[in-house]
Amino acid sequence: MPASDAAVVVDLLPEAGLTALAEAGPIDVVAGVHVANQAGHIVDVLDTVASALEEHSASGRTGVLVADGGSQDATPEVVRAWCESGTPAAPRHCLDVIAPKHRGRAIVALLLAGQRLGARAMVLLDADLTGVRKDWLHALLEPVLRQEADYVLPAYSRTVSEGTLTTNLLAPLTRALYGARIQQVMGGCAGLAGAVVGPWLEAGVETGEWQPHGAELWLTTAALASDARLVEVHLGRKVVTPGGPQPDLATILVRTVGPLFALMGRYQTAWLDRTGSAPVPRRGDACDVQADARSAATEQMVRAFDLGLKDLLPVWEQIMPEPTLARLYPLALLAPDEFRLPPPLWARVVSDFAVAYHERRLPRDHLLRALAPLYLGRVAAFIVEARATRLERIPEIFEKIDRAFEAEKEHLVARWR
């Protein structure tokens, strides 16, 4: 293990934890579960994971690692009791991550512990994915164990307006930057080859602006930037039970778009000269788009956009140049059921924000929060368009968004440099 990685292990795990890992001996297939405030669900999730790993015993010794990301309920005690019921043949380790505890440190601790155990294959899982099934673990591990992939991403079936932050910003921008057409940049689970973990950690494990909430984004970006062999696996519907109260939209943007922008700076040599995009091999059924149970109301979204145009204009003027603003002004005249914020304009807005973030024109938290009304405007426009589109043609809307971001990249690169 490189000296830098060893230092991080010491920073993340106490000596007793390192000793326990050393005594565990080599483990070939590791499942790492990061958890926060899931006392009511975590045992079911962990039992599913352990049961799935038992079926991989032919691939070598298996084990489960659990790291807490700062629970405020009884989760640590529940996890500790579960881990103590393990056996030498299928060990369970509860990693006591040194404070400050958060999701990012928990994920990195799991990766480093898996590396120390000599894992050939790992699966990372967010315990918020309470709908996890045994076949999910198999699907994520098999391409790695067969040496067909270095990094395995999930893909899900979803409703039209589900995951709009991913479909309208995170995935299109990632595709344009790194050239891979992936559905999820932070899908809550992933499969990894043990051989790639060390180099990725060595290059980017130091605490950066992607922490504490962008560790999944960092991992996916590291895979894309290193030209790792990628595979997507269709897992069906994504069922999530969040642990604890959920933040407001502006905070969500700070925690997701912020890390994505920060990683653009860290990995700029990997994307500045890259053009075009290509599909990633996908296993399993097609990821169908299902009808929404009820149509989302766009009136409040459009009202938020209009208020942003009125109240945040002095801030936006420091982020977006006049040509972009001039295209936004007329949108205030549109009724909610006729609202339009076309993908090319939206891609230009995101590009302007990325450049302003990179140049530190404003405090970054303040800048990202100013994106919220614009994002709501884009979601409203997406919903209005989707209502007028047959269900089987919804993927064409997603593709139109993706291509708009690809077309915007040349302009982004010119200003970034």
Task: List where the protein language model places each region.
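N-proximal low-complexity "stem/linker" segments adjacent to membrane-targeting elements
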Residues: 1-51, 410, 417
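Terminal low-complexity segments of carbohydrate-biosynthetic enzymes
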Residues: 2-3, 257-417
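Short beta-strand/loop segment that forms part of the nucleotide-sugar
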Residues: 58-71
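Conserved donor nucleotide-binding strand/loop of the catalytic core
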Residues: 65, 76-105, 109, 113-116
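A conserved acidic beta->alpha catalytic loop
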Residues: 68-77, 129
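Short beta-strand-to-loop element that shapes/binds the nucleotide-sugar donor at the catalytic cleft/hinge
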Residues: 152-164
